[in-house]
Amino acid sequence: EADRLEISLDLLEKLCFEPELAGWNGIGFVIQAYMKRCPFVIDYLIDLATRSRRRLMIRLVKGAYWDSEIKRAQVEGLEGYPVYTRKVYTDVSYLACAKKLLAVPNLIYPQFATHNAHTLSAIYHLAGQNYYPGQYEFQCLHGMGEPLYEQVVGKVADGKLNRPCRIYAPVGTHETLLAYLVRRLLENGANTSFVNRIADATLPLDEL
């Protein structure tokens, strides 16, 4: 959430300079494109990677706490919202942030979490055709996006895009995962959700 961002970055900074982790490039961080601060957080992460002389794994998501962020801002009487209030702004922000992450391959290992075919294809073209292993990866939730990523993972000779996809599967007790499940249902149950709209056989392709 927005109110935990700064303390999360403080912890990340300490981890990056932890002597026992020197030379290890497995430190990662998740950023949410619907946050208005996201591009500036990326600038900070690039600077941190430079200062700590390591390559950071950065997972870019669109964001799953929209309802709670809006509610918190209203309850606290904030002048504005920390997140974009229209989905189209988040979609544009995601691509802008993806471009920033791809621009520094020596410092950032981008991990693009999306189930949206438009977003995926845009990133594919932004990254260029000179792909090499370890340049970047896509990510999807376990149980979602398989039809899309079946066209991504695999050899070019087989008609695939030859790009890697990591499957994200949360693990824990039902008490821990219940809130996570509710957020996923809200996100993908929305009328504007790509996952929801693509399942509608009556929806014209032009509108999709």
Language-model regions, residue ranges each:
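Positively charged, amphipathic and often flexible ligand-engagement surfaces
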Residues: 1-208
